[in-house]
Amino acid sequence: MWQIMPAYDSLDAAREGFAWELPDDYNPAVDFVRKHDPERTALIAEADDGTVSTHSYGDLDRRSDRLAAALSGLGIDPGDRVAVVVPQKPANPIAHLANWKLGAVSVPLTVLFGPEALEYRLADSGAKAVVADPGVRDDIDAVRESCPALDHVIELGDSAAGEAHAFEALASASEPGFESHASTPETPSAIMYTSGSTGPPKGVLHSHALWLGRAAAAYNYFDQEVAEATLWTPADWAWGAALGGTLFAGFHYGATVLAWPREEFDPEAVFERMARHDVTHSFLPPTALRMLMGVDDPADRYDLSLETLAAAGEP
């Protein structure tokens, strides 16, 4: 089983010894879900109402197969842009995996965006379809006329109002076994937008190799213990460090990832979830880390399995 394994004792040793040797036919969808035991747990998902579901690598493979076939049936072709505006829910990776199996380019967007931010990015990227959480459906409908390329809205759930398609219907309609689009490490994979601090946000087109760079980084900042880990980050899966450095890095190594779409950061609730789901490795924004440090005696009050915390975003 091929994996990026940059195991070195020092940065100098890594600089001397490491070289990128990527498969010529690399496709992240195949890498993330088809090389692992299909019964291995990929996701533990806790919903807004507290219900918990588990999703194996085989589950994600089959559902993304079906969604890829459905997207193809809607006229999505290789190279087309498909936006994903979904929080930490199983539909998020399923949508990205389906895009890459089809050869489409993902446009990860956060559910925290308002209508103007969504309008700019959907129009600028030329998104032909958007997979959207119900919480952003009204905003997308409000700006759809300003996004001339946007032919399809796919709303999470069993049903969708108006002209939108229901995600669950598409992700269960076809048979699994979709033949993935032939790709290489240089095949366009995702458009990710800059923050816009020096002007309008800029869409940066990344190739499939992006995810391997993120995996290599995670392998080191999670102390080379990724494969048997349970990973979690509070960051939205639209951001690079969360999507690539936690979710898909975990999938590359066959880890388990916790999906928990909370609206606010409650440090007591975070420790409780970490204990409940046996989280071993977590990537935290510095603000979140400081809030956790303000909790009294968490190791005594919670049965934690934490081994490694990583943080980035501030000096």
What are the residue ranges of the model-derived segments?
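Adenylate-forming
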Residues: P87, A132-D141, W260-R262, V279-P315
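Conserved structural elements of the adenylate-forming
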Residues: D61-A69, P185, V204-Q224, L289-G294
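Conserved AMP-binding A3 loop
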Residues: S53-G58, S189-G213
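Conserved pre-ATP/AMP-binding loop-to-beta segment of ANL
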Residues: E39-T41, E155-D158, S172-Y193, P200, ...
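Conserved AMP-binding/adenylate-forming core of the ANL superfamily
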Residues: E39, L43-L97, G114-E119, A166-A169, ...
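Conserved AMP-binding/adenylation subdomain of ANL enzymes
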Residues: L212-T233, W237-H281, V295
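N-lobe entry segment of adenylate-forming
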Residues: M1-H55, D59-S72, A149, S159, ...
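Structural core segment of the AMP-binding/adenylate-forming
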Residues: G73, L97, K101-A169
